[in-house]
Amino acid sequence: MRKRIWKRLGWSITASEDKKKCLVWLFFFFVLQLILQYYYPMTSDDLYFRYGVEISNKNDLFNYVLHFGNGRYLGNSSVLILVRCHWLRALSKAVIMTAIYGELIYLLDLKNELQTAFAGILMLLPSVKMYAQVYVWTAGFQNYIVPIFLYLTAILCWKKCKEAKENGRKILLGAMIFLTAAPAQLFSENCTLFFAIASVGIGAVEVWKNKKIRKSTIILVVGSILGAGIMTAGPMLLKGDMGGQSNYRKVPRTLEAVFETIYQNGALAGRYLLGCTGLWSIMAILDCISLERLHQDKNRVWTQLRVVAGCGLAGFSVIHLIAMDEIVRPDLPKVYFFLFLVEMGYMIGHSWNYFKIGKGDAAILTGAGIFTVLPLLVVTPVSARVFYLTWFIWLMAVLKSISVEGLKRSLVAIRMLMLGMSAGLIIIALECCRYGQNDLCESVDA
């Protein structure tokens, strides 16, 4: 029975040599995630949902979730369940992380083993704050990782439905599209907004190109809009407010307050995105490799500016990782806001460059990542976890754009970069030890 279902969905049970290697990487990734997730502690809201909310039966669970004051019905309910069962929490998070890894491999068509391994490594390298708030924190994981998993599943089934010829397979895939696209909207507000717009955009592009729309696309659009409607209208209809949610994710009322919020949130976005050292480093390395073809480039000045910006962001990201995040200065938001503008300009330049060289998918993904930031500039509050979707989409763009040859050359550069960083860290550590010993001696003498 199970084999027939998989066959109808379009995934073959018998794997080629490449698929076997892919399965090995997926298994290794799953085991690693299971170990990590098992030992991650409960933090922040996890402790509140575990010890501050008394749930004695399913009626208490439904009543709390439905009247909590926001539309994160599946996110909040799953957190309440998982914080009460350690093994279920570790197992479910490991399975979902591995599933996202597998979906990236399939959707981005990563056929080479090196590309597969590189995707798994980069998945584990968001900023430190994102990692803590999204991978470790169960509430963050459920509200920001699970919707990505569900929507990627919907897109995967939608893609398979385009290739399906049997009616039974089309019906099964159509049901899967709806059952993943609609629930994906019931976790976090920024994911809901982006997924709804993405689904409508997919439908609009299909109508524009083909002058018609397929049934699977209609199901995707309807499911996304229906889920977004429940997410948005649910709290207003139920009129619940048990968690002080009435002022959550609100837009300022005055124009002056809007500009002030844009400045503050832009600085926060610059800070949180700057911490993604892996992303900026690999993009800077790819830019430097492209300089070899500079004599063939008609827009040499723009290419050179992009390379300078990429190397600058990578360098600042390393400094930020080591020390800058601990620096407290009155004018530091100005620095981060400027870096945010550089980040956005750099990504716009990359999107335009992808279009020029014929990598339309990477260009669209890069632009989509930029779009996810814009709504967050005018709402409060924001934190590192809300920018995870932005980082994830940019990660997809990098994986989609990079070739096997470019990846091999990048790994050589990354090795040299890591050696340089290691040498720098050793010097910093030795200096800290020396100053620490001097301070200790001075305190003893005193």
Regions found by a protein language model. Give the residues of each.
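Transmembrane catalytic cores of multi-pass membrane glycosyltransferases
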Residues: 35-84, 88, 182, 189-197, ...
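Membrane-interface micro-motifs in multi-pass membrane enzymes
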Residues: 72, 121-159, 188, 328-347, ...
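Signature aromatic-anchored transmembrane alpha helix within multi-pass, membrane-resident enzymes
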Residues: 304-311, 352-370, 405-429
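Transmembrane alpha-helices and membrane-interface helical segments
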Residues: 102-106, 153-160, 198-207, 281-287, ...
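Start-transfer (signal-anchor) and selected internal transmembrane alpha helices
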Residues: 1-33
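Transmembrane-helix motifs of polytopic, lipid-linked glycan transferases
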Residues: 94-115, 153
